[in-house]
Amino acid sequence: MAPTVLVVDDEASARAFIERALTQEGYQVLVAAEGEVALNILRSTKRKVALVITDLVMPGMGGHAFALEVGKLPSPPPVLYISAYEAPRGEMSKRFLQKPFSVAALSQAVARLIPQEVKAK
């Protein structure tokens, strides 16, 4: 079965772009418009989520606060941060894509962050 990616972004056009690109790459994609909904998906889905992609700036729970909550889950998936604003510094910058980004850049980032053993299943 293809790896599952959860996409969290308050912009419908961004969610649709990422969902379409990842589906064409063969991934299963779940989407949410806000952090609280995404946490509910992570807690309730039967699928093993291999990667979470989250916008950093969203109404309500922002991407960083959401990622901290994801980290508290059993076996948390890696998180890829996206934003149209300035790139974060430090460790987070290694898992960041500046909007707008190309399908190729998204594909490379996703492939880098999903563990090899997940891709092999």
Put a short name on every predicted segment:
Residues 99:
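A Lys-centered signature of the CheY-like receiver
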Residues 34-37, 61-66:
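Acidic catalytic/metal-coordinating carboxylates
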Residues 16-24:
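Charged docking surfaces used in two-component/phosphorelay signaling
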Residues 43-47, 69-76, 85-89:
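Conserved phosphotransfer cores of two-component systems
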Residues 55:
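Active-site residues of response regulator receiver
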Residues 58:
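Receiver (REC) domain active-site loop signature in two-component systems and cognate sites
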Residues 31-51:
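Acidic, metal-coordinating helix/loop segments flanking the phosphotransfer/catalytic sites
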